[in-house]
Amino acid sequence: MIAGDNLHNTLRLLRHNVGNDIQVYRFSSKLIPLATHESLSDWNPYEALREPFAAVGKYVKEHGLRVSFHPDHFTVLSTPRPEVLKSSIRDLNHHVAMFDAMGLDARAKNNIHVGGAYGDKPTAGARFRENVAALPERIKQRLTFENDDKTFNAPETLELCEALSIPMVLDIHHQWVNHEGETPAELWPRILATWQTPYAQAGSPADDPLPPKIHASSPKSASDPRGHADHVIVLPLLEFLRSIAPITDRVDVMLEAKLKDGALFALMEDMARYQEDGVEILDGASVRIKP
């Protein structure tokens, strides 16, 4: 069974991550192919794959990993079409059910974009807000919202996060190509506050709160500034981390680079070159930044 192989290989990847000090991981949303297809509505994949799901969840908990999903682009809560909204909610329920099958609490999040503007961004934003507010609590407590690179920018996404008490994942690359003149550091105090809400910290012990998360990537080329490069250029990320360090104890950085862990290893080598400039290497995938 493909789904069983996917879960087995996911466990192998997690072991690789732990061996390289990587504590943050995004699961593939395609772990169970066609899981939400109507023709398979009588199949319960979470029960059929109970043991491999549980094995993945057990490993995550044993090693204190922070995991997430990024449901596909067709999961759109700003849509004006009822059938698309229904499909989107079904997909979110599926992602929550996978976390539940792993035995993971609400610290495991589903990250989504606001979605399309459909020719009227204010109306689309209001529709998104209404649709999110109507979601079951089990879905809302696992949500994060991310600014995108073309439509809903960082200030607009942040306003929705604040209105709905949902944490915001700041994508600093998206913010660079889609902004209103603000800098990401200017928005950061408000973004940080979204990670202190009950939804953001659902499942977190009081003495070990879930840290905020950002996405980092670099432009593929001058002609394709929105595309992701193979690697992440160190200086823009380092400058941002320095700017938020005075008010930020911890932050998870999800790299979106074509070379995946290879990009991380290269970035850590680049970070090590700044050890005399306030960068302390903690392990193979973590740094401490002095303001």
Where do the model's predicted regions map?
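Active-site acidic/histidine proton-transfer and metal-coordination neighborhood
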Residues: 45-163
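Histidine-acidic metal/acid-base catalytic patches
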Residues: 166, 177-291
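Active-site beta-loop-alpha junctions enriched in small/polar residues
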Residues: 30-32, 72-76, 113-117, 146-150, ...
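Well-ordered, non-membrane alpha-helical segments in soluble/globular domains
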Residues: 3-11, 46-53, 88-93, 125-132, ...
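N-terminal pre-domain/capping segments
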Residues: 1-63, 67
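Acidic/histidine-rich catalytic cores of soluble enzymes
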Residues: 125-207, 211
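Short helix-terminating capping/connector loops at secondary-structure junctions
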Residues: 18-20, 61-62, 103-107, 203-210, ...
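Hydrophobic faces of well-ordered beta-strands that scaffold small-molecule active sites
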Residues: 23-27, 67-71, 108-112, 141-146, ...
